């Protein structure tokens, strides 16, 4: 019995060792968020000058079905001011075909073309804020915990997204209030990830590579979002969005 316990402990140690080696060998990307005091017209387009001056995160890597670069290009840009985080995602799609099985907020219907922003504001690899949209502006938000094992879809705040569908791509422009996110005062950086579900190609891909044998939302494989101007104080004022039943009575 003692021998079996020792073997079990050794196996646990080796698994932890190999996992930590994998994480340490992982390359973590950096994306830079520029501070802007310009007004932003939320319309799903990046025609404001600052968007085109900001570097884009590219080269998304598949987490499913293969371990390779995504076949369709995705770009992400972030800017911020004193009150909001703005994110712009351009998802290329050579087929011009999209799967949109539901328009209901926080819908759990599978098979949806979508992009997801994830912010680990305390950089603890345990919790993150989740914001999802799709080509027609579906809104889904959630709290991710336990390193990515648990996703609480009951969390709802007020935020905005506008989208635009062009020839061979769609775009999502997000506006997320800072007073709805908890973060350390004066934050200079967060851990960050972007996920894309491309139903036409059958690919799930991420901005910062997540190995194919790991779950897509594993917080241990986030990259870094770096603010050129540190954020102010966290002034979290959570506003809950009530659900409205679609059943006619």
State each model region's role.
Residues 1-7:
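N-terminal secretory signal peptides that target proteins for export/translocation
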Residues 9-20:
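Bacterial N-terminal signal peptides
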Residues 25-249:
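Structural preference for beta-rich elements and adjacent junctions enriched in aromatics
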